[in-house]
């Protein structure tokens, strides 16, 4: 079994938004090739959110998109598949905790960027 810390690291590094996690779980739950339009309809999301999520999930090695633009769940490794399973379990049991992990990971980059412009007294 994978440790909670490994799952937390995986969630923070793999999902730029909660939407990305929702897209992945949809593709995992209904294993078939999906067009972006079908994902938009199923999740009631925007085209932009879905295209960014699919791109990020592909970069993370969790989905593949064919030449026709259809995307399906296909983790690059057994370890990645196991981490997805654990992330799904954690999200089902503690959705707020998972949302905080994702939001804190994305906002830490913003905080660092903002800090670069903070005026300091010398």
State where each predicted segment sits:
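Short acidic, hydrophobic short linear motifs in intrinsically disordered regions
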Residues: 23, 32-42
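A short, conserved structural fragment
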Residues: 58-70
